[in-house]
Amino acid sequence: MSLFDHSVSELHKKLNNKEISVTDLVEESYKRIADVEDNVKAFLTLDEENARAKAKELDAKIGAEDNGLLFGMPIGVKDNIVTNGLRTTCASKMLANFDPIYDATVVQKLKAADTITIGKLNMDEFAMGSSNENSGFYATKNPWNLDYVPGGSSGGSAAAVAAGEVLFSLGSDTGGSIRQPAAYCGVVGLKPTYGRVSRYGLVAFASSLDQIGPITRTVEDNAYLLQAISGIDRMDATSANVEVGNYLAGLTGDVKGLRIAVPKEYLGEGVGEEARESVLAALKVLEGMGATWEEVSLPHSKYALATYYLLSSSEASANLSRFDGVRYGVRSDNVNNLLDLYKNTRSEGFGDEVKRRIMLGTFALSSGYYDAYYKKAQQVRTLIKNDFENVFANYDVIIGPTTPTPAFKVGEKVDDPMTMYANDILTIPVNLAGVPAISVPCGFGANNMPLGLQIIGKHFDEATIYRVAHAFEQATDYHTKKASL
């Protein structure tokens, strides 16, 4: 039995009782990585020397009264979250040897909580992708079946947790990039409310959509991690001055009287029968615990995919303009003048998907098309946000599938961008509205790959979605299933 089969609270107790050491936890992580990483390929960079040194330092503090629940816990960090002195590449050749000189706010907070960073996790390049096949280095595989993708863009973050390489991880979610891989890998992934967690130190893809969040084995562990990284940050003007509260207090298993909305659009065209049936089965579980549910409509969700790709690509074209070969990152050797420097550096440094989205965004922002595309997409985004607000006026949470289907095979969709983009059709509206959502395991498809249940909450009401997710988790055993890698 792996130490990582235990929850954070169980491991904390074992540490305080001196049944295990922090060094034991760190060595457990690196041993598992040595055993499976050649197949899973979840990590881009390991930090073994510093992690082992930190473990020895913390071992001397075991049993101290001020040790928090995350004391000594091994964590993996998505490679678009900067880490001081530890290579951060965004899985792009553009940043292949970039060593940041500061920590992201979330990393600072986790260091203050005495977690130990095991390494940096693979992803789709600059967080653009749904399968991890867009990594500029190598593709991560799904621990449940290595022939299948782990999802993206936080595929390495989800796969590392599912494979037992780390206890938990950080990912980022712009259009589903935490929830979709969490669903595909059978783990728990939360996208917080926009502004709940500081984005300082997150390499920007689409600044109005990006949000950092936790990926864990259980809902309780997820709540611990979000508790640690949440809160206003003077380094991020978009972080919200809203009380964080105690997420753990609501994990009682009680959902009696809870009002659940189920959008008909989330169970209709384009959603596979397996995903639909798993959600209906989950609703029966919650209904049996005293919750009620009704079908509702989110009428503008059908426009979400087009809206998202116009807005996110537009923001990406602006955000990625900083990678020009002048200040940091790769610089082309094939240069005769300044224009060559810009053009060749970006052509050689960026992968195909990143270039595709930069081109789309530049087009949408161009003077002749701004009103027809970018401005119109912003107007539709407001309508989508209003849809959620209208539903939440009468309901506590919204529930549906996280993804239309279970994970697909490696290479199956990589040459068809539109089919690939459609994998995020159920997660994208949440980012456009800025509300929080969690994915928890809720079954398996015919290919024995995991399915995820998406629970969506009101702005800054992560506590309620944790309450529902935890109640469902405790009433089922899906979270106890492990990939037999």
Swiss-Prot record:
E.C. numbers: 6.3.5.7
Keyword Protein biosynthesis (UniProt): yes
A molecular function (GO) term: ATP binding
Active site per UniProt: 78, 153, 177
Gene Ontology CC annotations of this record: glutamyl-tRNA(Gln) amidotransferase complex
Catalytic reactions on record: L-glutamyl-tRNA(Gln) + L-glutamine + ATP + H2O = L-glutaminyl-tRNA(Gln) + L-glutamate + ADP + phosphate + H(+)
UniProt KW keywords: ATP-binding, Ligase, Nucleotide-binding, Protein biosynthesis
Keyword Ligase: yes
GO BP annotation list: translation
Family to which this protein belongs: Belongs to the amidase family. GatA subfamily.
UniProt function note: Allows the formation of correctly charged Gln-tRNA(Gln) through the transamidation of misacylated Glu-tRNA(Gln) in organisms which lack glutaminyl-tRNA synthetase. The reaction takes place in the presence of glutamine and ATP through an activated gamma-phospho-Glu-tRNA(Gln).
NCBIfam families assigned to the protein according to its UniProt record, in alphabetical order: gatA
Description of how the protein assembles with itself and partners: Heterotrimer of A, B and C subunits.
Name under which the protein is recorded: Glutamyl-tRNA(Gln) amidotransferase subunit A
Taxonomic source organism: Bacillus cereus (strain B4264)
Gene that this polypeptide is encoded by: gatA
